[in-house]
Amino acid sequence: MDVVNACRAFVKVSERGSFTVGAAAAQMSQSVASRRVAALEKHFGERLFDRASRRPSLTPFGRDMLPAARRLVRVADVLEDEARAARSRPMRLAVPASCTTAELARLVADSRERDIRLDVRTAGPEQRAELVRTQEVRAGLLAVPPDQALWAVPLGLAGADEPQTRRVFVESLRLRRGEPGPARCIRVQPEDDVPHIQGRLARLRDAVGLRPAQLSVAPDLTSATADVLSSDDLLLCSPAQAAELGLYWRPVGELRLARGYVLDAAVEADAERLRGRLAPYLARALGATADHGPDPATGAGPGADAGTEPGARAEPGAPEEGAQAC
């Protein structure tokens, strides 16, 4: 039986002294209120009301039970209020710090139109995984290799000066004998300090004979960008980031690099709900493409013609590069 609503009918009828008026106060019909009170009496094994007169009056047992019934109804009402508040509370989502404020704002706005309230929290790759594991967030966009990803973001190298080539070969950064320094560096932002990106670049660095210091992880994107703007260094980033920062972007000649992301949640229903309603908007916020990055064999980015120039602020028709500096 529904003890809470039976107690609600019992309390309202006792307060109003009438089954008809009490039922209306409890927002139920008189017949439903009568059945619920009768069911409660049967459950307790004692009568709650004396029905001998026209106005129902409490029996001694009913007077004893009324305070507890009131407490139960109050607690149930509080529980309902808490449930409504919890349903309307924003869903906290851990997202990469590389996402721009504008794109995250658009994501939050679009989610509201689809009956999901998001509270986005930016964090690095390891921290996002930990936030999901400890359930400090409801869901998170986690970094994975592109071949395991739902969304992929192509990566390349961007600099402050406009290059004359379609691709940047990491080998071209090696200082030749007698060549004046300093050596040009590749600046890696924290979002890309993961084995499937920084680890692959480190192996390439060693293979082509660069110095260890020529590949460095910056403490944040601001520091990395400042280093690039004040030197000939290059930033590992996506085409969208390069465009936002006013840098010239090219794919890496020797490697096809991409960030990969999956949506994870402590409760799978949360992940399914977000994927089902927000997948294209999450992809846009990440700067993701349907492909997994530019192809070093052609220099073309995802969705780009092999004959067109990829990347941000690019000039069409730039020449191919061998091992010349970018």
Swiss-Prot record:
Pfam families: HTH_1. Residues 295-326 have a biased composition (Low complexity). GO terms for molecular function: DNA-binding transcription factor activity; transcription cis-regulatory region binding. The keyword Transcription regulation applies. Residues 1-59 form the HTH lysR-type domain. Residues 19-38 bind DNA. Residues 289-326 are annotated as: Disordered. SUPFAM superfamilies: Winged helix' DNA-binding domain (SSF46785). The keyword Nuclease does not apply. Keywords: Activator, DNA-binding, Transcription, Transcription regulation. Signal peptide: none annotated. It comes from the Bacteria. Positive regulator of the expression of the gene (blaB) for beta-lactamase. It binds to the blaL-blaA intercistronic region. Belongs to the LysR transcriptional regulatory family. This is HTH-type transcriptional regulator BlaA. It comes from Streptomyces cacaoi.
